[in-house]
């Protein structure tokens, strides 16, 4: 802390300066492999193109319940943010990122995001449902779909899932007033196959599972993110480098980002403008030495 009371984070300054010099060395405007989901950097390989088409169809056709699953780090959240950005003037949306709550807490958060109530408003459940129905009817008159996205839906309590299902009863004779997208890890599919969720499963009319990128898509993904960051077509990673990254990451976007970022940092330190497979191998070996292959991957993937 300085004499005038300001807190100084020297480690933060060091990290910022390294990142700044790393970008300057490779002539980039942004960090190409940031772990934060950013729709501007989305790469639509064959699988993600198909997933986006399924989601778009589900919303436009007012299908009600939509299910999207994929492994940790497969790009689900980034894909959804891209969907919302593309349709920001066509739909009203609420994004629930922490579904570990009671139904009333989740419902209040949904209504708050739609500006129907203030969070501290003291209304009974029946009044909340009435207000939500009025809101949905108003949006329906304007032909504006309303969608609620539950991220990490495998964490929703079983009793809460049943109450969420009841919201699908908010409909007219012609259309569903509310669209809901359940996004989660593969466990979500297993949960919804349980007999107790038969009615909910029957209402899911659109479902898609995101699989990892292929080797070819992994290379295209890396080059796409570099170009968005300002590489302008300059090849920084060789084919052998992309092959090594694919072998370690198994095509999981988050792991691709982690290894690619670490490799570019190593390249900056070693003043290597072109990164080959040998450099990637060294970086991967260092990652494995730190925590071991399985624990390393698990730790990185769990930090969504």
Regions found by a protein language model. Give the residues of each.
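Conserved AAA+ ATPase "SRH/arginine-finger" region at the nucleotide-binding site
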Residues: 96-100, 192, 205-218
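Conserved AAA+ ATPase "sensor/coupling" helix adjacent to the nucleotide-binding pocket
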Residues: 112-114, 186-187, 195, 216-232
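Mid-core helix/loop region of P-loop NTP-binding domains shared across ATPases and GTPases
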Residues: 102-106, 117-163, 172-175, 213-218, ...
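Walker A/P-loop nucleotide-binding motif
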Residues: 61-82
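Conserved NTP-binding/hydrolysis module of P-loop NTPases
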Residues: 30-33, 90-92, 101-120
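A short, basic N-terminal segment
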Residues: 6-8, 12-62, 294-304
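Short regulatory helix/loop adjacent to the ATP-binding pocket of P-loop NTPases
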Residues: 83-86, 188-203
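C-terminal alpha-helical "lid" subdomain
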Residues: 227-304
């Amino acid at each position: 802390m300085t004499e005038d009371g300001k807190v100084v984070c020297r480690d933060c300054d060091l990290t910022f300066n390294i990142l700044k010099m790393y970008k300057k060395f490779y002539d980039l405007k942004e960090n190409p492999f940031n772990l934060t989901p950013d729709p501007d950097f989305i790469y639509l390989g064959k699988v993600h193109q198909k997933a986006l088409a399924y989601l778009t169809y589900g919303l436009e056709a007012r299908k009600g319940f939509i299910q999207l699953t994929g492994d940790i780090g497969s790009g689900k959240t980034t894909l959804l943010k891209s969907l919302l950005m593309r349709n920001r003037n066509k739909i009203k949306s609420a994004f629930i990122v922490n579904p570990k709550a009671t139904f009333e807490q989740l419902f209040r958060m949904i209504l708050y995001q739609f500006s129907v109530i203030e969070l501290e408003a003291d209304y009974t459940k029946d009044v909340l449902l009435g207000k939500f129905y009025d809101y949905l009817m108003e949006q329906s008159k304007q032909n504006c779909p309303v969608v609620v996205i539950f991220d990490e839906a495998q964490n929703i309590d079983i009793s809460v899932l049943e109450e969420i299902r009841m919201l699908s009863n908010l409909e007219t004779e012609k259309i569903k007033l509310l669209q809901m997208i359940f996004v989660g890890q593969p466990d979500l599919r297993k949960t919804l196959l349980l007999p107790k969720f038969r009615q909910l499963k029957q209402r899911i009319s659109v479902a898609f599972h995101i699989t990892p990128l292929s080797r070819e898509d992994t290379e295209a993904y890396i080059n796409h993110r570099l170009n968005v960051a300002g590489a302008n077509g300059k090849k920084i990673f060789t084919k052998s480098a992309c092959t090594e990254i694919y072998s370690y990451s198994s095509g999981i976007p988050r792991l691709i980002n982690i290894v690619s970022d670490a490799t570019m940092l190593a390249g900056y330190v070693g003043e290597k403008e072109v990164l080959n497979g040998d450099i990637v191998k060294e970086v991967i070996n260092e990652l494995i030495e730190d925590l071991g292959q399985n624990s390393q991957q698990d730790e990185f993937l769990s930090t969504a």
